């Protein structure tokens, strides 16, 4: 009797899929399976990390810096946190004021004696002979009784550089914890569970092993016992546990057999009886950016400068490197074609997919890294 009432057990799938039988998922499908992260969740963790500091005696509070690696969305999280706490946000000075050493911007630290958040310290200096005076003055003022309570956010590369050039007293530092393969799995499951097409089974394309453990309601129907792939362990290691890097690589790894022409009613009928299998490229088959054949020392300087400032517009980058803007733009286009940098809102940055290989190269060449 119960067998008649229960949905039929899904037919076993082949333990692997030839890549020719699969296709990369469309952006619309990827947005269903790996949606954009909700950084409001991160503000809860940040609040927990700062709880003791917030509750301490005001006279004993040291200035605080929250350091995050590239693509951790550190500044965005701090802006959300400031909004929740009703603290005012201090935007970075414009580059002309930094180079002119205009200290009027520092007055915001003492305005109204109200608490503040400075989300992007990396945009408050420039690696230039005239570009460090303002941030040195900022560090001096942090310990003044006139400065109201504040939290500073800083990219990890900029923080490494500032520690290198500043020998004075340093603030209290908190660093975002890197994601492990377990936390990546929990995160990816949460993102997928929010889809209208859930539940999903994530299996490695070349051997059929499960990349994410199946949902409990489906695990009991799987025969033979579930074997787990090592994909997430390699992803966590390669991405250095940086959520934005891991998220981009995860999206790139997914393949499917979806018929996106199905109507919503037909999709609901399909998912009434079985989960959708999303196939994951094996780690060795995952295509990652590589340096162009004509990669030059100038391009290495460009990448390093972009990382030290968490992104720059072309003209300012050219000014810092003492190169013609047209030449810098040509180099950026070459690096963009290789997948190493990206451009958005007139700002060039090292891309999430390119970051691991760029960091490894710069570290190997003896550049200052985070």
Across the structure, where does each feature detected by a protein language model lie?
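A short, basic N-terminal segment
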Residues: 1-60, 363, 368-369
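Sensor-1/coupling segment of RecA-like P-loop NTPase cores
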Residues: 122-166, 173-184
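Conserved small helical "lid"/interfacial subdomain of P-loop NTPases
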Residues: 174-228, 237-238
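The conserved phosphate-sensing helix
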Residues: 224-251
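Winged-helix-like regulatory helical subdomains adjacent to P-loop NTPase cores
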Residues: 243, 248-327
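Short amphipathic alpha-helical interaction segments
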Residues: 322-338, 343, 353
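Terminal-proximal interaction/regulatory segments of ATP-powered molecular machines
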Residues: 339-370
């Amino acid at each position: 009797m119960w067998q008649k009432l229960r949905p039929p057990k899904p037919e076993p799938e082949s333990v692997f899929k030839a890549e020719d039988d699969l296709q990369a998922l469309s952006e619309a499908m990827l947005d269903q399976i790996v949606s954009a992260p909700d950084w409001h969740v991160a503000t809860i963790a940040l609040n927990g990390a700062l709880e003791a500091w917030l509750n301490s005696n005001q006279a004993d509070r040291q200035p605080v810096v929250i350091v995050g690696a590239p693509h951790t969305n550190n500044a965005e999280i701090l802006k959300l946190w400031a909004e929740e706490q009703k603290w005012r946000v201090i935007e970075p000075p414009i580059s002309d004021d930094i180079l002119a050493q205009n200290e009027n911007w520092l007055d915001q630290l003492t305005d109204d004696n109200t608490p503040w958040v400075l989300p992007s310290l990396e945009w408050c200096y420039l690696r230039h002979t005239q570009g460090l005076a303002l941030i040195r003055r900022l560090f001096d003022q942090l310990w003044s009784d006139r400065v109201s309570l504040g939290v500073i956010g800083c990219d990890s590369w900029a923080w490494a550089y500032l520690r290198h050039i500043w020998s004075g007293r340093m603030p209290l530092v908190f660093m975002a914890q890197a994601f492990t393969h377990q936390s990546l799995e929990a995160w990816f499951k949460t993102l997928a569970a929010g889809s209208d097409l859930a539940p999903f089974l994530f299996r490695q394309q070349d051997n059929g092993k499960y990349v994410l453990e199946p949902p409990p309601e489906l695990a009991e129907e799987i025969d033979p016992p579930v074997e787990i792939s090592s994909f997430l362990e390699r992803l966590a290691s390669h991405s250095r546990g940086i959520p934005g890097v891991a998220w981009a690589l995860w999206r790139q790894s997914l393949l499917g057999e979806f018929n996106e022409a199905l109507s919503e009613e037909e999709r609901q009928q399909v998912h009434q009886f079985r989960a959708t299998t999303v196939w994951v490229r094996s780690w060795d088959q995952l295509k990652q950016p590589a340096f162009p054949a004509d990669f030059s020392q100038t391009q290495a300087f460009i990448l390093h400068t972009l990382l030290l400032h968490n992104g720059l517009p072309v003209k300012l980058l050219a000014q810092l490197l003492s190169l013609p803007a047209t030449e810098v733009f040509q180099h950026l286009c070459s690096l963009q074609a290789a997948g190493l940098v990206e451009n958005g809102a007139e700002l060039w940055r090292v891309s999430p997919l390119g970051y691991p290989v760029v960091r490894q190269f710069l570290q190997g060449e003896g550049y200052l890294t985070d």
